[in-house]
Design a protein with these regions (language model features):
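A generic, well-ordered mixed alpha/beta core segment in the N-terminal half of proteins
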Residues: 74-123
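Alpha-helix boundary/interfacial micro-motifs
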Residues: 31, 62, 94-95, 125
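General alpha-helical segment detector with a strong preference for membrane-spanning helices
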Residues: 18, 82-84, 129
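A non-catalytic alpha/beta surface segment that caps or lines the substrate-entry region
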Residues: 22-70, 74-76, 80
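Charged catalytic carboxylate motif
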Residues: 2, 32, 36, 120
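Conserved small/polar residues in nucleotide/adenosyl-binding loops
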Residues: 14, 120-127
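N-terminal hydrophobic or amphipathic helices/low-complexity stretches enriched
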Residues: 1-28, 44
């Protein structure tokens, strides 16, 4: 499975946090993605992959031979999503050959303003066509 295919699969998992909760994680459903990640890490050879009671996923890979003395690399990311936008029944869309302009959602025709015209800070990342 390619990295973008994994990401498209992950965003389908309902992980919306609960702002009224006093627990960590704020919603038990957040463990669904954590357990999925542990399963995938183990399938990729991360034998010690695990999730703790706070929904943190851990795992380690041995160093490449000859690099054992090099600094270790750590990765960290949020797995929950903000309650501001719905997180249930997400159906991601891959826009192949995206040109950097506004995005039209095929199901509704709704236009998402994401172009450099709408967000001037994106202009620094434009490439000439």
């Amino acid at each position: 499975m390619r990295a973008y295919e994994r990401l498209l699969d992950y965003v389908k998992v309902y992980t919306t946090s609960d702002p009224e909760s006093g627990t960590h994680p704020s919603a038990a459903r957040e463990f669904d993605l954590a357990h999925k990640l542990v399963e995938e890490l183990k399938a990729l050879g991360v034998e010690d992959a695990r999730v703790d009671e706070h929904c943190y996923v851990y795992g380690s890979l041995p160093a490449t031979p000859g690099c054992e003395e090099k600094p270790a690399l750590g990765l960290i990311a949020h797995m929950d999503t903000a309650p501001d936008a719905g997180g249930e029944n997400v159906n991601p869309i891959l826009h192949e050959n995206y040109d950097g302009g506004d995005v039209v959602l095929p199901a509704t025709g709704k236009v998402m303003k994401v172009s450099a015209v709408s967000y001037t800070h994106l202009r620094a990342h434009e490439t000439s066509q």
